[in-house]
């Protein structure tokens, strides 16, 4: 019989709580510091992303609570446990540079979600698995759209 809601799943979800918290700060940073062509369109898009990934973070934390885990809840814990890294804004960046950084973080999340999908499938945790599949599908679409903005193919 498969083990459902194992320590591995709880650790994975908690890692994503940390990642998503750091990522939402990065999105805000892009939102505040962007300049140049497509400002109005991308500024609004960052609002949408901030909301979407804030909701993802909340869903992941609530799923973790539902399976008996304890989500990280301090800035120190987020920074110590995230693979998404802070990106201090020390000098102006072009819109393309900001979008490249955003895509890089989305790709990191996509790859980690893929690992989580495999883990939860192996463990038979269908609820967490379905949640991660839906989140990964959204991330895949964002990667495609931002790469198109940058004039790149989705798998480039």
UniProtKB/Swiss-Prot annotation:
Disulfide bonds: none
SUPFAM superfamilies: Ferritin-like (SSF47240)
Ligand binding (Fe cation 2): 62
EC class of the enzyme, as a word: oxidoreductase
Keywords from the UniProt entry: Cytoplasm, Iron, Iron storage, Metal-binding, Oxidoreductase
Domain of life: Bacteria
Signals that turn on the gene: By iron limitation and stationary growth phase.
Main location group: cytoplasm
Reaction catalyzed: 2 Fe(2+) + H2O2 + 2 H(+) = 2 Fe(3+) + 2 H2O
Subcellular location: Cytoplasm
Annotated residues for binding of Fe cation 1: 31, 58, 62
Gene Ontology cellular component terms for the protein in this record: cytoplasm
Gene Ontology terms: biological process: intracellular iron ion homeostasis
Alphabetical list of Pfam families matching this protein: Ferritin
EC code(s) of this entry: 1.16.-.-
GO molecular function: ferric iron binding; oxidoreductase activity, acting on metal ions
Family assignment from sequence similarity: Belongs to the Dps family.
Domain-level remarks: 12 di-nuclear ferroxidase centers are located at the interfaces between subunits related by 2-fold symmetry axes.
Subunit composition and interactions: Homododecamer. The 12 subunits form a hollow sphere into which the mineral iron core of up to 500 Fe(3+) can be deposited.
Function per UniProt: Protects DNA from oxidative damage by sequestering intracellular Fe(2+) ion and storing it in the form of Fe(3+) oxyhydroxide mineral. One hydrogen peroxide oxidizes two Fe(2+) ions, which prevents hydroxyl radical production by the Fenton reaction. Does not bind DNA.
Protein name per the record: DNA protection during starvation protein
Organism of derivation: Listeria innocua serovar 6a (strain ATCC BAA-680 / CLIP 11262)
UniProt lineage: Bacteria, Bacillati, Bacillota, Bacilli, Bacillales
UniProt gene name: dps
């Amino acid at each position: 019989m498969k083990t459902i809601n194992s320590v591995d799943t709880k650790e994975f979800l908690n890692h994503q709580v940390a990642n998503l918290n750091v990522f939402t700060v990065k999105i805000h940073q892009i939102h505040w510091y962007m300049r140049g062509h497509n400002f109005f369109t991308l500024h609004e898009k960052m609002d949408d992303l901030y909301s979407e990934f804030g909701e993802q973070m909340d869903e992941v934390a609530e799923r973790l609570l539902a399976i008996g885990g304890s989500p990280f809840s301090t800035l120190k814990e987020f920074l110590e446990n995230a693979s998404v890294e802070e990106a201090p804004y020390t000098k102006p960046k072009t819109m393309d540079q900001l979008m490249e950084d955003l895509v890089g973080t989305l790709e990191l999340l996509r790859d980690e979600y893929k690992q989580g999908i495999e883990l939860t499938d192996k463990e038979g945790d269908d609820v967490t698995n379905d949640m991660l599949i839906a989140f990964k599908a959204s991330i895949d679409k964002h990667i495609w759209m931002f790469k198109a903005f940058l004039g790149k193919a989705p798998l480039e």
